[in-house]
């Protein structure tokens, strides 16, 4: 067989599966994987794992999960790394059904309780999917097992409450955590500032900004979007331009949604020239504005700042 080149072909196909999977080239990895099976070789756990992780890296967790089920049908055991990689992908996508499927598989394969990271990812997945009750139940179950939620996990649950505008539930959660001696950090404060800004609660948002500074942190970049929108909404020229200055300096970090939100807020606040300047930046990045923003840009300027975008002075 070696003389006919079968062994070398098998070795080559195996090496290609690992190589293409690590690089995220799932099309080539799949081709090498199918070639391997065509030689009559039964892929082992390592080859399956390489393929599954390759699909995850390529943003195709559903295909990876399909291979994991194929493994289980062949009585091959998936590693914890595989489960967690799939779960991270589903959490990032906000795919609650995908996360639930992985949860069932993990509980079936494991005799012990799930890890803190697993529960934290369930909170994230259900929260992003708008299934707040399930996010909270996983959060509570995690705490019953003795796990201490970190700032990211708390922020994901608060963000879920923000999605359904349940400020009372969020405040009860934070008060209970404070009572239990669990401190929140910059990530959670950032979610809260954005929430307060959206509600127009400027004083409350600024109090939270003070708490961020007391932690020795500058407001995160993404928070400048919220601040710019909040201050332009009340036509506070000084603070609008402060936040806008940070955004302009780091505009390469802005995505289409951030541009859309900021430009619309500037237009509504009467900062006409600033809005048009940001719109040009958006066009230069070849981002497609929303239909609403396109309509806003052809509408007549608002009364405030119709000439320069900044006419009157406001107290800071």
UniProtKB/Swiss-Prot annotation:
Pfam families: PPR (PF01535), PPR_long (PF17177). PPR repeats lie at residues 9-43, 44-78, 79-113, 115-149, 150-184, 185-219. It comes from the Eukaryota. Keywords: Repeat. InterPro entries: Pentatricopeptide_rpt, PROP1-like_PPR_dom, TPR-like_helical_dom_sf. NCBIfam families: PPR. Belongs to the PPR family. P subfamily. This is Pentatricopeptide repeat-containing protein At1g19525. It comes from Arabidopsis thaliana (Mouse-ear cress).
